[in-house]
UniProtKB/Swiss-Prot annotation:
The lineage of its organism: Bacteria, Bacillati, Bacillota, Bacilli, Bacillales. Belongs to the CarB family. It comes from Bacillus subtilis (strain 168). Its cofactor is Mg(2+); Mn(2+). Pathway: Amino-acid biosynthesis; L-arginine biosynthesis; carbamoyl phosphate from bicarbonate: step 1/1; Pyrimidine metabolism; UMP biosynthesis via de novo pathway; (S)-dihydroorotate from bicarbonate: step 1/3. The keyword ATP-binding applies. Mg(2+) 2 binds at residues 298, 300. Mn(2+) 2 binds at residues 298, 300. Binds 4 Mg(2+) or Mn(2+) ions per subunit. Mg(2+) 4 binds at residues 832, 834. Composed of two chains; the small (or glutamine) chain promotes the hydrolysis of glutamine to ammonia, which is used by the large (or ammonia) chain to synthesize carbamoyl phosphate. Tetramer of heterodimers (alpha,beta)4. Interacts with BrxC. Mn(2+) 4 binds at residues 832, 834. Residues 133-327, 671-861 form the ATP-grasp domain. This is Carbamoyl phosphate synthase pyrimidine-specific large chain.
Length: 1071
């Protein structure tokens, strides 16, 4: 059926900020969809609150609204734009939930807006647990025995009939939020209450647990003509019971017989037809390992994390084709862009194995509960491609950048057998490594199958890897053994360690023996047809399929998996850099391993290599391609950390030189440079031993800021208030030695200011200055940032401009530069300089219209800023106020303290823009998920050091009509200042205490600041966690509270500004 001509204007809903369960895969899907619709000639209107994405770039749609994703804001945009249709299936759960709500409120009908792609009734049938179960029963398709419940009593009644264990699945939530497996009454109470709270329709499905079954997924496409195909089928190595986003997944499935494969394939196609889904859809099934009994777990009627993985695993662009299906095109009318010869109706075929391993944030959150279940905890994922499962899996392991390069964990050998068994039985994020350790201790495949319920096929493969380790150790220097090790996916780093030689020596040995990988093409058709895509992976075979052209090429290193501290902002910069390289007339080559992102879409670069970002894997590509240089500025710390090794092997690093990168990152050299340039910095020194650290800290004076050198996202950074805490930090957070020194700085309290700049060595362009709302000490990625600055004098701005220019020139920066300053007692100090792209680059680029990553790339390639018409210094400020606010995923991570500090904790960001600071703040806070009711109660629990400031805040809350709740001591202190406060019991006291108030929804805001030092924080920790579990905004910085107050004050009439009219009777005029 040809595309529709009765519609012209289409509104696309984005997925908003990156949170656990909804990451960069929707930026990729949304970007593909917008471009596909524009390609077909439609006018595209995009709404998304996330400034860090490619999707919100002006080139992606005809009009882009970076506004909060709430029904209220969308209603205004729909009334203003009057689109003919809306496409909600590319914005994740957020997009679906909004479409359903806009329909229920009657907005779509009022404005005559049609829903494209999958119909709302189908979305509701797939998402509403009750409707879905009813449909499955009508189709005679098996679902686990289950019950829809709306209260704890209903849950207890159901369990008394079928017994434990049961799985709880809340309706309309994302990434399994609020769900879990319950094995007893206590767990049932906790999980059901939480699940009902988090479900927007207060409904949960309780089902008999089928944990231990194989979990199989089918990614299916269907068009309006009822053509339906399977794009990819995938198998979770972890059995049912662990969220698929937290499972290690392989494609194609490895353990299904043809009969099983066809059985589940037919079921998946039957379901997509029964639901009437038009576009992409993900079907999750459970299969009994010992029979043909299967159950349907769920259907996602939208583009999902799995479809991004399936797209990258097969090369088949699901989101692009789903968008075209939505406007009426059918699969047999569209060409498959990979081959350019076959139609999209051909099912892809794979002649390789793909492995996906999730990337969890537990390196950031040491205290988090690492146990995996039905609620997702990973922030991102990596994918690797190999000819065998072993090769693909080992490549994925070293892509994780989790300090592992083989199936080995540093301290796994030290734990007892008992603990090892426990960690295999109760799945955690490191189970794969513990399985390998168990084999080294003599456990058998049967033992481990019994402990983990993982299929014996996968366990045999792992056993084979561990067995080969012995052969490798026994045959040092044997090139036949070396070749087999490389075919299995063993890394040079591991082999060189076992053979007691340098990695570079092993590399030379391999070269002499002719043991080098070849590159194979991902072509969707197992080499049956010729293919046009330049999408490659390495493997140790004979024939190389990657043809090197005569054109000069430039290689860009991507940023790997999404994790806290290194998010989608770096992918944004990578993509812009690739576009700039192509514009400059060079061939752009990208190396990356993240299946969720735009940068790994094969249509972005001239050549895409899907490989681990390690020195070995990158060098293989360089050996073949011989690029004129490598760009490391845009891939975050991942790429910067490779610069040294690459340079040592004779590779040219483009942009800022290695010596100058080192001057910015190495503490002593940096201090020296600042001294020469006359730029002040806080008093600080470098310690290489614990004793030295203690004496430095006492010389400088507490509190001090301590951090390891060369890190991103403030990893292991802390503010320390006395010696005892310093010793605890030294012992637990860092491994201090002369190679890994620790930096100790005087902790300055003051306003933090951030600047991004582009320099070509002669001219320095500063697009803008951003002022942070939270004072120094809160990581810049977790602060609310405002542009243009609202409280800085012209003198201070001038000084920041001078220092930035001096630093850029003094450090010989070529390309991008990010500087953080602190304004303390009228003086500007430099906190740190990052000679690379930063997480504020997309935000500033969008506001100022200065395409920073694109410009920086052209500078790196030898052009000058003056040629583009830029003059030196701070550029004129834009009209309006722009606010960037962080977004956290604390609800998904139990036992994590939400207090803001120098270590980054946010997973994403949103932007609010308007004519005044208050309005822009309001939009940013609403977009980040904070409710701002203009009446209610605020619960105040502040540390003694914050009492005075807390008092001022309480006064202002009281003035706008808020009730103040506080514990006895604080309430007394407030009463002395004539502020009425209701007394609430401390934790553990009888009567309504702090936790009861939060649980019962009696407080709209909780303001809680840490007591000095970390230890007495346990009560504070419980208050903060209780707030998160109950969805109450908890503010751990008084600056954030002040910002919310500004918004509330601008929205409400203050009581003291509404005096009653004087009714003095005597003066009344008598008639």
């Amino acid at each position: 059926m040809p595309k529709r001509v009765d519609i012209n204007k289409i509104l696309v809903i984005g997925s908003g900020p990156i949170i656990i369960g909804q990451a960069a895969e929707f930026d990729y899907a949304g970007t593909q969809a917008c471009l596909a619709l524009k390609e077909e000639g439609y006018e595209v209107i995009l709404v998304n609150s996330n400034p860090a994405t490619i999707m919100t770039d002006t080139e992606m749609a005809d009009r882009v609204y970076i506004e909060p994703l709430t029904p209220e804001f969308l209603t205004r945009i729909i009334r203003k734009e009057r689109p003919d249709a809306i496409l909600p299936t590319l914005g994740g759960q957020t997009g679906l939930n909004l479409a359903v709500e806009l329909s229920e409120r009657g907005v779509l009908a009022e404005c005559g807006v049609e829903v494209l792609g999958t119909k709302l009734s189908a979305i509701q049938q797939a998402e509403d647990r009750d409707l879905f179960r009813t449909l499955m029963n009508e189709l005679n398709e098996p679902v686990p025995e289950s019950e829809i419940i709306h209260s704890l009593e209903e849950a207890e009644k159901f369990v008394s009939q079928i017994g434990f264990p049961v799985i709880v699945r809340p309706a309309y939530t994302l990434g399994g939020t609020g769900g879990g497996i319950c094995s007893n009454e206590t767990e049932l109470k906790e999980i059901v209450e939480n699940g009902l709270k988090l479900s927007p329709v207060h409904q949960c499905l309780l089902e008999k647990s089928i944990a231990g079954y194989k979990e199989i997924e089918y990614e299916v496409m269907r068009d309006s003509q009822d053509h339906a195909i399977v794009v990819c089928n995938m198998e979770n190595i972890d059995p049912v019971g662990i969220h698929t986003g937290d499972s290690i997944v392989v494609a194609p499935s490895q353990t299904l017989s043809d009969r099983e494969y066809q059985l589940l394939r037919n079921v998946s196609l039957k379901l997509i037809r029964a639901l009437g889904i038009e576009g992409g859809c993900n079907v999750q099934l459970a299969l009994d390992p010992d029979s043909f009994q299967y159950y349907i777990i769920e259907v996602n009627p939208r583009v999902s994390r799995s479809s991004a993985l399936a797209s990258k695993a097969t090369g088949y662009p699901i989101a692009k084709l789903a968008a075209k299906i939505a406007v009426g095109l059918s699969l047999d009318e569209m060409m498959n862009p990979v081959t350019g010869k076959t139609y999209a109706a051909f099912e892809p075929a794979l002649d390789y194995v793909v492995s996906k391993i999730p990337r969890w944030p537990f390196d950031k959150f040491e205290s988090a509960n690492r146990k995996l279940g039905t609620q997702m905890k990973a922030t991102g994922e990596v994918m690797a491609i190999g000819r065998t499962l072993e090769e693909s899996l080992l490549k994925a392991v070293r892509s994780l950048e989790a300090d592992v390069y083989h199936l080995e964990l540093k301290d796994a050998a030290d734990i007892s057998d008992e603990l090892l068994e426990k960690r295999i039985k109760k799945a955690g994020d490191e189970r794969l490594f513990y399985l390998a350790e168990a084999y080294r201790r003599g456990y058998t495949v049967e033992d481990l199958h019994e402990f983990s319920a993982i299929d014996v096929f996968f366990l045999h493969k792992l056993f084979g890897i561990v067995q080969f380790e012995k052969e490798l150790k026994a045959n040092a220097g044997d090139t036949d053994v070396l070749r087999r090790a490389k075919e299995l996916g063993f890394s040079d780093q591991y082999i060189s360690r076992e053979w007691k030689m340098k990695e570079s020596e092993l590399y030379s040995l391999r070269k002499q023996a002719g043991i080098a990988p070849v590159f194979k093409m991902v072509d969707t058709c197992a080499a049956e047809f010729e293919s046009e895509t330049p999408y490659f992976y390495s493997t140790y075979e004979e024939e190389n399929e990657s043809v090197v052209t005569d054109k000069k090429s430039v290689m860009v290193l991507g940023s790997g998996p999404i994790r806290i501290g290194q998010g989608v902002e770096f992918d944004y910069a990578t993509v812009h850099s690739v576009w700039a390289i192509k514009q400059a007339g060079y061939e752009a080559i990208i190396v990356n391993n993240n299946p969720e992102t735009v940068s790994t879409d094969f249509s972005i670069s001239d050549k895409l290599y899907f490989e681990p970002l390690t020195i070995e894997d990158v060098m293989h590509i360089i050996d073949l391609e011989q690029p004129m240089g490598v760009v490391v500025q845009f891939g975050g710390q991942t790429a910067i950390n490779l610069a040294d090794e690459l340079s040592a092997r004779g590779v040219k690093i483009l942009g800022t030189s290695l010596e100058d990168l080192d001057r910015a990152e190495d503490r002593d050299k940096f201090e020296q440079a600042l001294g020469e340039l006359g730029v002040p910095q806080p008093l600080g020194k470098t310690a290489t031993s614990v004793n030295q650290a203690v004496s430095i800290a006492s010389d400088i004076g507490y509190p001090v800021l301590v951090r390891p050198s060369y890190v991103l996202g403030g990893r292991a950074m802390e503010i320390v208030y006395h010696e005892e805490e310093l010793l605890h930090y030294m012992k637990n957070a860092v491994k201090i030695n002369p190679q890994h020194p620790v930096l100790i700085d005087r902790y300055l309290t003051g306003k933090e200011i951030e600047v991004d700049a582009v320099s070509d060595g002669e001219t320095v362009v500063i697009p803008g200055i951003m002022e942070h709302i939270e004072r120094a000490g809160v990581h810049s990625g977790d602060s609310i940032a405002v542009y243009p600055p609202q409280s800085l004098t012209e003198d201070i701005k001038k000084k920041i401009e001078q220092y930035t220019i001096a630093l850029a020139k003094g450090l010989n920066i070529v390309g991008l530069l990010n500087i953080q300053f602190v304004l303390s007692q009228g003086e500007v100090y430099v906190l740190e300089v990052n000679p690379r792209s930063s997480r504020t680059v997309p935000f500033l680029s969008k506001i100022t219209g200065i395409p920073m990553a694109n410009l920086a790339t052209k500078i790196i390639l030898g052009q000058k800023l003056a040629a583009f018409g830029y003059t030196e210094g701070l550029q004129p400020e834009q009209q309006g106020v722009f606010v960037k606010a962080p977004v956290f995923s604390f609800a998904k991570l139990r036992r994590v303290d939400i207090t803001l500090g120098p270590e980054m904790k946010s997973t994403g960001e949103v932007m609010g823009k308007d004519s005044t600071l208050e309005k822009a703040l309001y939009k940013a806070l609403i977009a980040s998920g904070i409710q701002i009711p203009n009446y209610g109660s605020v619960l105040l629990t502040v540390a003694d050091k914050d009492k005075e400031e807390g008092l001022a805040i309480a006064k202002r809350f009281h003035a706008i009509g808020y009730n103040i709740l506080a514990t006895e001591g604080t309430a007394g202190y407030l009463k002395e200042a004539s502020i009425p406060a209701k007394v609430v019991g401390k934790i553990g006291q009888d009567g309504p205490n702090l936790l009861d108030v939060i649980r019962n929804g009696e407080a709209q805001f909780v303001i809680n600041t840490l007591t000095k030092g970390k230890q007495p924080a346990r009560d504070g920790f419980r208050i903060r966690r209780e707030s998160v579990e109950n969805g109450v905004a908890c503010l751990t910085s008084l600056d954030t509270a002040e910002a919310i107050l500004r918004v509330l004050e601008s929205m409400t009439f203050r009581a003291d500004q509404m005096p009653a009219v004087n009714t003095n009777q005597e003066a009344a005029v008598t008639i």
